[in-house]
Amino acid sequence: MKFMLGLACTAALCFVAPAFGQAAAVTTGKPAADQQLDGHYDLQNPFAKIIRGELPADKVYEDAEVVAFLSTNQKAPGHVLVISKTSQARNILDMSPADLTRVMLVAKRVASAERIALGADGLIVQQNNGAAAGQTVFHLHVHVIPCWNGKPPSFARVKSGQLDRKALAARIAAAMH
């Protein structure tokens, strides 16, 4: 059995560590085909819908190729996702070097903006590939999560009532310039 970020896994069984007061989820076998490293791009995934303007997002940056917005699952106030608008890459294995470079350059700018706007003492830059690695939306995305001294990073979701998402996005966006 191995343990990774809240998962206890054997070859065919994973237990997802629950948040306080919740029951553990158990999955067996392999994830669905489109949740593995190889699969088909789903045009109805939430990030594709954000790109098309079908879902709202608290954007901190956008250009013709990349958009960065607050994650709906805030691991810390200011947790931003950076995605390509031009690529239908599900994971890093599908992404062209040019598109990956553009996404990472914007992730770096977001990290700098979080440091300035939020006074972050540290930053987590994370990118997951496949359900086995914790990927839940199969459109390549990079997490940029601010951290502060004295407050160890938490992978528990920040309660939405604790955040003014629009104000937070505006602060980060202002520091992007």
What residue spans do the PLM features occupy?
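Hydrophobic helical h-region of N-terminal Sec-dependent signal peptides
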Residues: 9-13
